Amino acid sequence: MIDEALFEAEEKMEKAVTVAKDDLGSVRTGRANPGMFSRIVIDYYGSITPITQLASINVPEARMVIVKPYEASQLNAIETAIRNSDLGVNPSNDGSIIRISVPQLTEERRRELVKQAKSKGEDSKVTLRNIRRKAMDELGRIQKDGEAGEDEVGRAEKELDKTTAKYVHTVEELVKHKEAELMEV
């Protein structure tokens, strides 16, 4: 029972870190990268679909992105979605592809994005702590029901604390790396 609770908590923490990586990956940096478009969606025949599934996204230069829709009919919808996104870019459409020039970030915008990255990191750490709290409650229930002794539960709680600390540290490192990437000129 204890091993099950610990395994389940670690699995959930692993998923939370994966979500944190994806969230931080969507924060725009000064360089062009296909990941910055992962959160942009359009209405594609009645279903909300990420543009990454509707077009190929290439980065031929450090500050240039080319988006080539698989269906020409979706060109304008994709262009509008990119323009209306929070990326702060202005796409240009030449009839078959969309070119996006990624402007240099201003100091003010960099600081804004660092705050955004830190906020996403903090949200991830809160998620990890909530997973830990639920697992601790489960361990307490196991002890209360007499399925495990006090010593076993105590060891499991220490193990859970170590696991939580490991994943919190991972999130902190991800945020630190993103911050360095953003502040790089």
UniProtKB/Swiss-Prot annotation:
Gene Ontology biological-process entries: translational termination
Pfam families noted in UniProt: RRF (PF01765)
Top-level division of the source organism's lineage: Bacteria
Predominant location: cytoplasm
GO MF annotation: an example: ribosomal large subunit binding
Cellular compartment(s): Cytoplasm
SUPFAM superfamilies the UniProt entry points to: Ribosome recycling factor, RRF (SSF55194)
InterPro entries noted in UniProt: Ribosome_recyc_fac, Ribosome_recyc_fac_dom, RRF_sf
GO cellular component entries: cytoplasm
Keywords, ordered alphabetically: Cytoplasm, Protein biosynthesis
NCBIfam families the record matches: frr
Primary role: Responsible for the release of ribosomes from messenger RNA at the termination of protein biosynthesis. May increase the efficiency of translation by recycling ribosomes from one round of translation to another.
Protein family according to the UniProt entry: Belongs to the RRF family.
Protein name: Ribosome-recycling factor
Lineage: Bacteria, Bacillati, Actinomycetota, Actinomycetes, Mycobacteriales
The gene coding this protein: frr
